[in-house]
Each structure stands twice: as structure tokens, then as C-alpha cells.
């Protein structure tokens, strides 16, 4: 149940909130929101959320970005 709520929240963000941001360009492939979806689907709500938060913290102006799939 928690997994479903998290996934719906991320999808809501992608559809309604992300387009409102200026310079909405993720440095990583897949994007941080897609990474979060993949991590939650693969590892569950708790571990997947933790992985997503770590990824979002790495996504900053000083990071190189690049290809970083869920492992």
C-alpha cells in the first residue's frame, strides 16, 4: 500500500509540478523521478525511498551526472 502511494505521488509530481519548474533538466539518466520509481518498484517503499533520497541529494549543480541506473 505504501509503495502505491509513493508511486502515485511521484507520478503526480511529474505531471503537475515538474513542468512548473524553470530549467527543469536532470543531469542524470534516468531522471531522478524515474530513478525513484524504479527503486521503489524493485526494492520496496523503504529501501527504494532511501535510494531515491540519496540520488536527489547527489543531483546538484556541482555533480557531473551521467548514466546511473538502479542496481
Curated annotation (Swiss-Prot):
Principal place of residence: membrane
Entries under Pfam families matching the protein: YidD
One cellular component (GO) term of this entry: plasma membrane
Membrane topology of the entry: Peripheral membrane protein
SMART domains listed in its UniProt record: Haemolytic
InterPro entries: Membr_insert_effic_factor_YidD
Compartments where found: Cell membrane
Alphabetical UniProt keywords: Cell membrane, Membrane
Family: Belongs to the UPF0161 family.
NCBIfam families in the record: membrane protein insertion efficiency factor YidD
Physiological role: Could be involved in insertion of integral membrane proteins into the membrane.
Protein name per UniProt: Putative membrane protein insertion efficiency factor
Species assigned in the record: Clostridium acetobutylicum (strain ATCC 824 / DSM 792 / JCM 1419 / IAM 19013 / LMG 5710 / NBRC 13948 / NRRL B-527 / VKM B-1787 / 2291 / W)
Lineage: Bacteria, Bacillati, Bacillota, Clostridia, Eubacteriales
Amino acid at each position: 500500500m505504501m509503495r502505491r502511494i509513493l508511486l502515485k505521488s511521484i507520478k503526480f509530481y511529474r505531471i503537475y509540478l515538474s513542468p512548473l519548474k524553470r530549467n527543469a533538466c536532470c543531469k542524470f539518466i534516468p531522471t531522478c523521478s524515474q530513478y525513484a520509481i524504479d527503486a521503489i518498484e524493485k526494492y520496496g517503499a523503504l529501501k527504494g525511498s532511501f535510494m531515491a533520497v540519496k540520488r536527489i541529494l547527489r543531483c546538484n549543480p556541482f555533480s557531473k551526472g551521467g548514466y546511473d541506473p538502479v542496481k
